[in-house]
Amino acid sequence: MQGLKVMISEEEITKRVKEIAAQINKDYSGKELKLICLLKGSIFYTVELSKYLTMPVKFDFMTVSSYGSGTKSSGHVKIKKDLDESIEGQHVLVIEDIIDSGRTLSELLPLLKEKKPASLKLTTLLDKPARREFDVDVDYVCFEIPDKFIVGYGLDYDQAYRNLPYIAEIVE
């Protein structure tokens, strides 16, 4: 059985998400924003962030993965669920749970740009720059973390731990 060590508390997450929302509110003042939640891991961050956004928002969802089961990236990016609506001419914010190698987003963002949004920005709850293999420009980062396998607040280990209200490291 693995144990969990809290890395980022629920209170720390809420505080930082409010700070990110304040910056997004400033950047998109007077505009409508389309939020693209990358399922499943980003759902917690998307919901929390959207509560503090003051502009009109619309939601869409994608399922994109480079993970199979376990803790390592499979090296293959799959779009399992595409957008339901066009993003042409809209201001779009892609919401990610964690950026590891950058492979998924390095392939996804160019595909989204082809759909001709008015603007396209990216936010992530967690960033692991030590693992980066592909260049990804991230506009809003909540937390930079070390190269540890973490769970909670939407992130899972074989579909478990997703419901934790905090970010934890799995320890042996």
Task: Describe the function of each predicted region.
Residues 1-172:
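PRPP-associated nucleotide enzymes
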